């Protein structure tokens, strides 16, 4: 395969990482369609493109749970609704098979997401989860699961306002049924079920531009095992560079530089307090209680990893977490999988007591985050991860370039359903480069 072909292959593979072609400066001319072309979304309570927002808050606040039908919309005759009991191993296996065979795959069928059962248990069952919010569509005759969507409860803070909502995720329709327009019906059905609990807002993300993003962040990628990435044709050799040079460029120390260590149950109280104080700087953020924080952050082997740094007095001053979502490599004689780490939540007290954007506060935080995230990359590499991904959300712009994260080819858009909101900075400038000065005001991270 030529280097040009490898470059094209890389562009295709990046889409697997939720990196879709997206150019913030060209949304209007390239990705954004006329509102009338959004046959489904034009009927929903979402902010229209170019809508002048005068006040933040719910778009439609007139409905009550008793106004919502007790029965779902009818499906085509060959299909039936189901509630997926993810506590049942067989039903969880159905979700596992559907996602791993249909969620995302490159055109050559070389790489495929490998959602583990442990990952699904973590992502689908946080505190307060509802079985009836795990919505499926099955073939009547065979009972095969061919469609799925999940909602999980989340309390958001949107510029200081508490917004009781859900996160929508894992929307998946079998690849052979994409023409049946099951996705809009799945969205309507999970909305109906959530509305019955008197919840009217939702947060979701995607690479496709819909009406209307509240924020857009860019992906960045840090090779941890460049040699393997090259061997499996996940990355190309840049012009005027040798393999030896590329391997040397991305080589990390064998062990962390700081006294970082695995977060344990005994650290949760301090880390939770640190997290809440740190997150207050962001305009779109989760409002976790301690049980939710414990669920999402404490280490689960092969799923999520969290680490803390303590000062000389034993106080937790920093924590960092990342989750693992590998690819299966199909028909490769050398490798069966590709390890991928995703930046999750972190916090540091480095700039506490300073204005967030002051020169001194910024420099203190930049230095601390460079140490913290570099150690996270080392730990991820030692866990056999081959690439580390991060968005430009949170304060990530302070370390991305310094730590050799390369800008990805696409963007992740954040959407609030049934909620008007002024735009929130996503950590990128108009020319799409990392915005170290303004950074991002998006604090929430979705799987």
Curated annotation (Swiss-Prot):
The active site is at 447 (proton acceptor). One of its GO terms (molecular function) is glycylpeptide N-tetradecanoyltransferase activity. GO terms for cellular component: cytoplasm. Coiled coil: none annotated. It is found in: Cytoplasm. It comes from the Eukaryota. It is an enzyme of class 2 (transferase). SUPFAM superfamilies: Acyl-CoA N-acyltransferases (Nat). Pfam families: NMT, NMT_C. Keywords: Acyltransferase, Cytoplasm, Transferase. Its EC number is 2.3.1.97. Tetradecanoyl-CoA binds at residues 38-41, 171-173, 179-183. Monomer. Adds a myristoyl group to the N-terminal glycine residue of certain cellular proteins. Belongs to the NMT family. This is Glycylpeptide N-tetradecanoyltransferase.
């Amino acid at each position: 395969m030529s280097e040009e072909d490898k470059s094209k292959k890389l562009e295709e593979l990046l889409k697997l990482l939720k990196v879709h072609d997206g150019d913030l400066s060209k949304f209007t001319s390239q990705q954004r369609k006329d509102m009338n072309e959004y046959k489904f979304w034009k009927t929903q309570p979402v902010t229209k493109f170019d809508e002048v927002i005068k006040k933040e808050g719910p778009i439609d606040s007139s409905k009550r749970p008793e106004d919502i039908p007790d029965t779902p919309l009818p499906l085509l005759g060959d299909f039936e609704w189901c509630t997926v009991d993810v506590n049942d191993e067989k039903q969880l296996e159905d979700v596992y098979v559907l996602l791993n065979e249909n969620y995302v795959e490159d055109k050559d069928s070389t790489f495929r997401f490998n959602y583990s059962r442990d990952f699904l248990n973590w992502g689908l069952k946080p505190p307060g989860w509802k079985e009836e919010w795990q919505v499926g569509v099955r073939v009547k005759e065979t009972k095969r699961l061919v469609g799925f969507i999940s909602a999980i409860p989340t309390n958001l803070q949107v510029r200081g306002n508490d917004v009781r909502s859900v996160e929508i995720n894992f929307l998946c329709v079998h690849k052979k049924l994409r023409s049946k327009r099951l996705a809009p019906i799945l969205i309507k059905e999970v909305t109906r079920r959530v509305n019955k609990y008197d919840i009217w807002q939702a947060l979701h993300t995607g690479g496709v531009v819909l009406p209307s993003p509240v924020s857009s962040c860019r992906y960045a990628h840090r090779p941890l095992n460049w040699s393997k990435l090259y061997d499996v044709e996940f990355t190309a050799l840049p012009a005027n560079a040798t393999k030896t040079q590329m391997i040397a460029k991305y080589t990390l120390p064998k062990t962390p530089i700081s006294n970082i260590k695995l977060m344990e149950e005994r650290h949760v109280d301090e880390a939770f307090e640190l997290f809440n104080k740190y997150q207050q700087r962001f305009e779109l953020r989760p409002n976790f209680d301690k049980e939710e924080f414990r669920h999402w952050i404490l280490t689960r082997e092969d799923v999520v990893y969290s680490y803390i740094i303590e000062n000389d007095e034993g106080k937790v001053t920093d924590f960092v977490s990342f989750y693992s979502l590998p690819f299966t490599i199909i028909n490769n004689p050398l490798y069966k999988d590709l390890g991928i780490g995703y930046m999750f939540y972190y916090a540091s007290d480095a700039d506490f007591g300073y204005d967030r954007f002051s020169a001194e506060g910024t420099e203190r935080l930049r230095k601390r985050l460079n140490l913290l995230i570099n150690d996270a990359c080392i730990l991820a590499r030692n866990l056999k991860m081959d690439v580390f991904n991060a968005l430009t959300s949170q304060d990530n712009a302070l370390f991305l370039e310094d730590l050799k994260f390369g800008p990805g080819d696409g963007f992740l858009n954040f959407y609030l359903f049934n909620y008007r909101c002024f735009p929130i900075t996503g950590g990128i400038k108009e020319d799409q480069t990392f915005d170290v000065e303004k950074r991002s005001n998006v604090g929430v991270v979705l799987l």
